[in-house]
């Protein structure tokens, strides 16, 4: 079953209110009234179809729809009365009257409302009609009095009046045709009048179209609003025979007017208006490039805020255009927001990376500096010895190897001298010639001054006073040979005995001034 079904009354209502109808089809109207009670939603569907035709732009259609509405109210009973007294119907009536429809349509609708209020005044269920009339009167809408219901009476008695008028028109047409036939037989004139008289008659019987008419049958004539039509036969009050540039045929007489003087100017103005409208439509049909314009959005919001919601005026064309343009901006605004969001995410990630880099930099700056191991291996400066004074020999040995000062003879010492916790790997990076003893020239050892204040006993006293006091011959030790000092007694008074470790005894040399030396490690 489809979601949206067609209104079952729409086709019959359109047929009963066709713009080409010259009279009301009461048989069809009564058939519609009979069908209203056959379905549960018949009254609602019928009223909806009728009000759709009441809002038609052709006044003839709206008047026929109001006639059908009055017939349904009079013949369909309470089920239709409840629909007429509903809020939806009251809103439709307000829109028809306030939108300045055709005056005849408004007057007929007002008269029907007054008539229904008089009929329903005893039933409180139908009080909405009277309340609607009262509220519209307060708004300035005028309604006819209850005693002068001419239009409503005409709507009720429309059948008899229209039928009588139709009978009279037919009788007149028959009379005229009989008279013409008698004249043709009695007169001796030519069957066809001269061409000049035909042209004059045509010029004298021209009418102007008030509405557009589209031919449905083959014998009908099609014309547009404002066109001139030559009347060939107007014997029938409702359908005339005429001719224009499209051909010859029948057309409804209420679609034309015989007043040609005032319509000439209006026709030219209408043509100009049509041309202007066409130009505007062409301009509007060319779509302008749409882009995000904050000014247009602000202007649309300003217009919307300035509108009073209580007013029932239609929206201006400027507002409609701005709303259309703003709606077209929607997808572009969404794309722009997505792009901004993406850039924001990228910048946020970049900001995090920059902060991490700055944090790492600050951490490295605040850490204790790591000095190179070579900075601790710089040579230590020793003060030069006094001239003519023997210099004491300081043998030094590390746990990783023997260390001798520059120009010092190699001695084997049991005492260890630690240079600190420096890694030995850094010392092994020195040149290999620093680790060889034979690569250096043997120098005589430094001699001390023979003072008792020396704290380290591992040195050798070469004072001449020791030899004189001992009274023994000096023992000459070959240069470069190691000797065991423990087997000898130190004859110096007040000096402790030497420890038992080998010491190299050099040949006596003259005291010379000693330059400062630098201690270098040997591997």
Swiss-Prot record:
Q: Which GO terms describe its molecular function?
A: phosphatidylinositol binding; ubiquitin binding
Region (Interaction with HGS) location: 334-368
Ranges of residues in domain ITAM: 360-377
Domain SH3, by residue range, is 202-261
One GO BP annotation is:
protein transport
Summarize the PTM comment.
Phosphorylated in response to IL-2, GM-CSF, EGF and PDGF.
Q: Where is this motif: PxVxL motif?
A: 54-67
Keyword annotations from UniProtKB, A to Z: Cytoplasm, Endosome, Membrane, Phosphoprotein, Protein transport, SH3 domain, Transport
UIM domain residues = 165-184
Where is this gene product found? Cytoplasm; Early endosome membrane
- How does it associate, per the subunit comment? Component of the ESCRT-0 complex composed of STAM or STAM2 and HGS. Part of a complex at least composed of HSG, STAM2 and EPS15. Interacts with JAK2 and JAK3. Interacts with ubiquitinated proteins and the deubiquitinating enzyme USP8/UBPY. Interacts (via the via the PxVxL motif) with CBX5; the interaction is direct. Interacts with VPS37C. Interacts with ubiquitin; the interaction is direct. Interacts (via UIM domain) with UBQLN1 (via ubiquitin-like domain).
Q: What is the annotated role of this protein in its UniProt record?
A: Involved in intracellular signal transduction mediated by cytokines and growth factors. Upon IL-2 and GM-CSL stimulation, it plays a role in signaling leading to DNA synthesis and MYC induction. May also play a role in T-cell development. Involved in down-regulation of receptor tyrosine kinase via multivesicular body (MVBs) when complexed with HGS (ESCRT-0 complex). The ESCRT-0 complex binds ubiquitin and acts as a sorting machinery that recognizes ubiquitinated receptors and transfers them to further sequential lysosomal sorting/trafficking processes.
| Protein's name according to its UniProt entry | Signal transducing adapter molecule 2
Name the source organism.
Mus musculus (Mouse)
Q: Which gene encodes it?
A: Stam2
């Amino acid at each position: 079953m489809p979601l949206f079904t067609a209104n079952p009354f729409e086709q019959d209502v359109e047929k009963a209110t066709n713009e080409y109808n010259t009279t009301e089809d009461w048989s069809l109207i009564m058939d519609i009234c009979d069908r209203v009670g056959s379905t549960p939603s018949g009254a609602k569907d019928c009223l909806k179809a009728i009000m759709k035709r009441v809002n038609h732009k052709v006044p003839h259609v709206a008047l026929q729809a109001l006639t059908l509405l009055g017939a349904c109210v009079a013949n369909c009973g309470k089920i239709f009365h409840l629909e007429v007294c509903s809020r939806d119907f009251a809103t439709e009536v307000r829109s028809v009257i306030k939108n300045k429809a055709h005056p005849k349509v408004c007057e007929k609708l007002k008269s029907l409302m007054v008539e229904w209020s008089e009929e329903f005044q005893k039933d409180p269920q139908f009080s909405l009609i009277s309340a609607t009339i009262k509220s519209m009167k307060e708004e300035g809408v005028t309604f006819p009095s209850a005693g002068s219901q001419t239009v409503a009476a005409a709507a009720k008695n429309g059948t008899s009046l229209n039928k009588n008028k139709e009978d009279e028109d037919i009788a007149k047409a028959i009379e005229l045709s009989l008279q013409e036939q008698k004249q043709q037989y009695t007169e001796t004139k030519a069957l066809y009048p001269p061409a000049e008289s035909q042209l004059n008659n045509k010029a004298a019987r021209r009418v102007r179209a008030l509405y557009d008419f589209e031919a449905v049958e083959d014998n009908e004539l099609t014309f547009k609003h404002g066109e001139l039509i030559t009347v060939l036969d107007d014997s029938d009050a409702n359908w005339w025979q005429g001719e224009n540039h499209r051909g010859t045929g029948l057309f409804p007489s209420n679609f034309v007017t015989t007043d040609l003087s005032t319509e000439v100017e209006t026709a030219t103005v209408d043509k100009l208006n049509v041309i202007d409208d066409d130009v505007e439509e062409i301009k509007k049909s060319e779509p302008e490039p749409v882009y995000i314009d904050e000014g247009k959005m602000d202007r649309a919001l300003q217009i919307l805020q300035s509108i009073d919601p209580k007013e029932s005026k239609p929206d201006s064309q400027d507002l409609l255009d701005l709303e259309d343009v703003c709606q077209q901006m929607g997808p572009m605004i969404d794309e722009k927001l997505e792009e901004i969001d993406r850039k924001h995410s990228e910048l946020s990630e970049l900001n995090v990376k920059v902060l991490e880099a700055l944090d790492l930099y600050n951490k490295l700056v605040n850490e204790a500096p790591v000095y190179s191991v070579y900075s601790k291996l710089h040579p230590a400066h020793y003060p030069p010895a006094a001239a003519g004074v023997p210099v004491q020999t300081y043998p030094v040995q590390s746990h990783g190897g023997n260390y001798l000062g520059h120009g010092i003879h190699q001695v084997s010492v049991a005492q260890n001298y630690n240079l600190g916790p420096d890694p030995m790997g850094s010392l092994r990076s020195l040149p290999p010639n620093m680790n060889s003893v034979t690569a250096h020239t043997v120098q005589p050892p430094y001699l001390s001054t023979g003072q008792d204040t020396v704290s380290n006993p591992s040195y050798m006293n070469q004072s001449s006073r020791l030899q004189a006091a001992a009274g023994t011959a000096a023992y000459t030790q070959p240069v470069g040979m190691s000797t065991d000092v423990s087997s000898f007694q130190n004859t110096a008074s007040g000096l402790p005995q030497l420890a038992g470790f080998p010491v190299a005894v050099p040949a006596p040399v003259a005291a010379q001034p000693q330059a400062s030396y630098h201690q270098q490690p040997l591997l």
